[in-house]
Amino acid sequence: MRVNSRNIAYHELIGLEVRILQYPDPSLVGLKGKVVDETLKTLVIETPSGRRVRIFKFNSILEFMLPDGEAVVIKGSTIIGRPWDRLKMVSR
């Protein structure tokens, strides 16, 4: 299944480019990078300089760049959960 704006909440996020649009820590707003790890409640983003930042999904608004170039804005609360459990939630 290819990732698109309709299924991003159920798709693998590792490897996607991301930008933080809203976050409780204002110093992280605007941070861009690639998702390199994901847990139940967090994402690890690697910036172009190689710095890794762990952020909580809850209370964040994120913009993901899909492989086809489309930008998708999503609330972090919609992607809370273990990656493999979210993948199981896809309707067949």
Curated annotation (Swiss-Prot):
Subcellular location: Cytoplasm
Enzyme Commission number(s) from the entry: 3.1.26.5
Family membership noted in the UniProt record: Belongs to the eukaryotic/archaeal RNase P protein component 1 family.
The organism's place on the tree of life at top rank: Archaea
Coiled-coil intervals: none
Protein name per Swiss-Prot or TrEMBL: Ribonuclease P protein component 1
GO BP term (any one): tRNA 5'-leader removal
Record key words, sorted: Cytoplasm, Endonuclease, Hydrolase, Nuclease, tRNA processing
Cellular component terms (Gene Ontology): cytoplasm; ribonuclease P complex
Principal subcellular localisation of the protein: cytoplasm
Listed GO MF terms: ribonuclease P activity; RNA binding
Xref: InterPro entries: RNase_P/MRP_Rpp29_sf (IPR036980), RNP1 (IPR023538), Rof/RNase_P-like (IPR023534), Rpp29/RNP1 (IPR002730)
Keyword tRNA processing (UniProt): yes
Intrachain disulfide bonds: none
Function: Part of ribonuclease P, a protein complex that generates mature tRNA molecules by cleaving their 5'-ends.
Catalytically driven reaction(s): Endonucleolytic cleavage of RNA, removing 5'-extranucleotides from tRNA precursor
Subunit relationships: Consists of a catalytic RNA component and at least 4-5 protein subunits.
